[in-house]
Amino acid sequence: MQAPSTQRVIVGMSGGVDSSVSALLLMEQGYQVEGLFMKNWDEDDGTEYCTAMDDLADAQAVCDRIGIKLHTANFAAEYWDNVFEHFLAEYKAGRTPNPDILCNREIKFKAFLDYALSLGADLIATGHYVRRRDIDGRTELLKGLDPNKDQSYFLHAVGGEQIAKTLFPVGELEKPQVRAIAEKYELATAKKKDSTGICFIGERRFSDFLKQYLPAQPGDIETTEGQVIGRHHGLMYHTIGQRQGLGIGGLKDASDDPWYVLRKDLTRNVLIVGQGNEHPWLFSRALLASDIYWVNPVDLSTPRRLTAKVRYRQSDQACTLEKTENGYRAVFDEPQRAVTPGQSVVFYDGEVCLGGGVIETAQAWYEDAR
């Protein structure tokens, strides 16, 4: 294995504290470190929703502080073609996609990695809270040490070959430790708030953003019995398990329990709702997934006992995974709430992230009980 002092590493600098500390730690470990700030969205309305200029200034301040060069690259065209158009297509089809997962696969671990290698880098590094392990000729993706910050869910579609060319310096740390290091070295990002939400939406209301690209198609809101109790502005604005923004209230003979989105009937353009956080239609026993990406090849010649997450920050859920003619079927030991088509299911074997795919359909718990 090459000594760090002979290896050139380019760190993806986002202007946040995690990538800042990643660059600092790699320097301390003896690597030849440079930074790269990538711009993935071109603001066309003059209001700088993505705060790209502020983030670039913060990244530059950190690089100046620790004495490394900062490259810049614009991957907006790649982002539009490989992430954003898919994002719109999924919403148009009535599903709820996760663009961060595609961004990691197509931009950070493809466009950025390729560009860094073209600059002469041996490796790249990011501020993700994950770890890697080289074992038996392959590179595994492991959960980050901090369970509150583990980001393996978002990196499940990145292949082992890409993981093998990446360092994750903060994956072995907990978030408070990272902030403490940034403060100790007086980095400009030490107290910077973590970014939330999707870059290209920024602080705008999601519905306002989506209206710019997709025409709204209003339709009926129905109960599970087929009673029309309201109107929706477009199925794309709603997701399974949603409670807020339905505009339902004051119905005769209805209880005071809150209403939740249970289903989206795409054929009829109808939103199906029900009352109560424990409504049986909210819970699923099994799901079918497609577009599966494995970090490394996985043997599913027979059903396999694993754990899974159907959303970020969910605790590990025991399941049995099997390959079928129609995709991959996961059957859970316990009912899963608000399993959402378009979102990702990610599979684990202990601390190893095996990979995952897109949820196509969910089998309701009550259907299984019949």
UniProtKB/Swiss-Prot annotation:
Full protein name: tRNA-specific 2-thiouridylase MnmA
Organism this protein belongs to: Ectopseudomonas mendocina (strain ymp)
Enzyme class of the recorded protein, top EC level: transferase
E.C. number(s) listed in UniProt: 2.8.1.13
Active site as annotated: C103 (nucleophile), C199 (cysteine persulfide intermediate)
Lineage: Bacteria, Pseudomonadati, Pseudomonadota, Gammaproteobacteria, Pseudomonadales
Region feature (Interaction with tRNA): 149-151, 311-312
UniProt entry keywords in alphabetical sequence: ATP-binding, Cytoplasm, Disulfide bond, Nucleotide-binding, RNA-binding, Transferase, tRNA processing, tRNA-binding
Catalytic activity: S-sulfanyl-L-cysteinyl-[protein] + uridine(34) in tRNA + AH2 + ATP = 2-thiouridine(34) in tRNA + L-cysteinyl-[protein] + A + AMP + diphosphate + H(+)
Covalent S-S links between cysteines: C103-C199
Entry's localization field: Cytoplasm
One Pfam family hit: tRNA_Me_trans_M
Recorded GO CC terms: cytoplasm
Domain of life: Bacteria
Annotated region described as Interaction with target base in tRNA, given as residue ranges: 98-100
